[in-house]
Amino acid sequence: GTCQMGYGGSVTINGGTVKATAKGNGFGIGGARIYNTGAMTVTINEGTIEATANRNNAAIGDKGKGESGVTINGGVIHAVGKGGAAGIGSKGDIRITDGELTVSAEGSGAAIGGFTDSYSERVDCESITINGDVIKSISSKDGACIGAATGGSVGSITISDAELPLLSSNKILIGWDADSPGGKLTIRNCRVASTDTLSVLTDGIRVGSNSELVIEESEIRLPHLRGIRVGGNGSIAVRDSDLHTYGIFMDENAKSPNDAKTLKRLEITDSTVLTGDIIGARGEYSSVEEIVIRGSIIRLNDEYTYNRCTIGGGEKASFGSIDIQDSQIDSRSSVNAVIGNGTQSQSYGESLIRIANSQVSVRNELFGPAIGAAYGSSGGQINILIENSTVTAKGGNLRSGTDYIPGIGKNSSGRASEIGKIQILNSTVESFRLEEKDGTNYVYDKLHTKELPGIPAENITICGSTVNGKTIDHSFDEYGKCTLCDKYDLGYCYEHGLLTLEGLTDCAHDGSEKKLTGLSHQTGENETKQLTENTDYTASYSNNVAPYTLTPEDEGFDPAKAPKVTLYGTGNYCGKAEHYFTISE
């Protein structure tokens, strides 16, 4: 093999065996202690490498004032950082695409990422890119396994197509916790797990303020007390993934309203989440603008002794909207609403809870409703919309013998929290309250008779639904508009030939998904409205690729195999319609 020293401090290793130890304040392999003004890069293409940094900087790395970076394209590499050193570190870009790496940091440095330099100054990494199953073992103490040194940040981290089954750290596993001007952490098509046993709440995957965290097509297994967390003004997106985590949240615990922080957006799409704590904002004065849950399953991890999960804002804070569609939620909470805001929340605007096309079972264990305004909250207006769903909600224990806590809404005692409108459309809802203080006997509350604390009867709409065993049907005109809820019902419109579906006739198999190209509704004798997806309706498909030529009228028709589109009303539309179609050979 060869080892080349380039002008300005660049190092390239193409093979052989290299053992390097920095006993003082230098790098094991890479930049010198007195930092060069030119380019200082390290490239490893092959070889067997053992490198150690005993005090600071990195076992493999650099800190040039010009171009700076570490690139690893192969090799069997063992890198150890001690003191403030990283195992592999750089001021610039770290890119790892191949090889077999065993990396550790035994002090404040990251195993891969940031470190402390010879002048005791923290060095933050611009970017870290890891592609492929290259990490065989990685551990750290007070810095991250992959990310920043203690108190530092990273510009961006991208980890893809990787197996990381044995992460171990006293602090963060992946990411950083410092305030930052804006960074992004992306984990895509990975399996991430940790074997740590913890006694206190510790961040698992974390980014600081003003940053974005994205998890896609991945399996994340974090041990008890490790969560997925962002800082203030951050956002989280989880897509097509399977997560076991203590929670998914912003946790800021501000001391006063002047220090209040906000989670901008939390999205969970087509994922399964097994959790034991908050999904949304956690702590005092911690608000959330938007929570979007689509096609996902969220339930409690029975292994957790503290086993309560809320979806929404933190204490003394607020939320903008919680939109749950095509999902399954099974959870319980204490004091905070399971779906809604935290205790003593203060809001000055309107908030929306929407549950559509979903199955929800939630229970509050203390003082508040399961869905709506938590105990002690005040101001603002929470609107609740339930459509095409099955919901069971149980209110919490009473504060006194005269208290009344419904499953959905607000409790009768405490501050004058506001519930605006409750709309229940095309759904089956059971809303329970405890009959007496410290009791165990649940009975239906009076949602079905529209007699809930602090909510005028005219603000409660129930249509095409069964609530607490009482069925209230729609009342349609000839074009499918209900005179009670003032919405058009897609089911009625479809059954009476008022809908025209485009793009699903004469479909031929070509390997592509067959979907609607248009949907229109006859709203009058000579009037037709073109409907807009995600405004008037949403659509879900099944079996819409493979050939299938039987219709519901044909002998041998199998609905489990037939191409189908299911339309769900939203906005000015409600209800659902199912349409089977054929795909020719």
Give the residues covered by each predicted segment:
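Solvent-exposed beta-strand/loop surfaces, strongest in extracytoplasmic domains of secreted
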Residues: 469-585
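Surface-exposed loop/turn motifs in large extracellular/passenger domains
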Residues: 1-22, 29-53, 60-81, 87-106, ...
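Substrate-binding N-lobe of the ribokinase-like
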Residues: 144
